[in-house]
Regions:
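Structural detector for short beta-strands of small beta-barrel domains
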Residues: 1-12, 44
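OB/S1-fold single-stranded nucleic-acid-binding modules
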Residues: 2, 40-41, 62-65
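Short aromatic-glycine-enriched beta-strand elements
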Residues: 14-19
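Short nucleic-acid-contacting surface segments enriched for D/E, G, S/T with interspersed K/R
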Residues: 35-46
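A residue-level detector for short acidic-glycine micro-motifs
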Residues: 9, 21, 34, 60-63
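OB-fold/S1-family single-stranded nucleic acid-binding modules
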Residues: 50-65
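Beta-strand/loop nucleic-acid-binding surfaces
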Residues: 25-37
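Short, mixed charged/polar active-site loops
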Residues: 2, 25-27, 56
């Protein structure tokens, strides 16, 4: 299921950040390897969630133009 969110934090040096799901309000971990393009804090994005051993993780992260 595709979700809508906003990037609340992204650290380009470390290659990860967090996305706030606009519907549930939940904060989801996002790694640069799962982004179609590099995001910045404040970007609106679409994404999907997969469960990893560390909890939910955003995949297929795409900026909404």
């Amino acid at each position: 299921k595709t979700r809508r969110g906003k990037v609340t934090m992204f650290n380009p040096d470390k290659g990860f950040g967090f996305i706030r799901d606009l519907d549930s309000g939940e904060s989801i971990f996002a790694h640069v390897t799962n982004m179609k393009e590099q995001v910045e804090q404040g970007d609106k994005v679409t994404f999907e969630v997969e469960q990893s051993h560390k909890g939910p993780s955003a995949i297929k992260v795409t900026i909404v133009k």
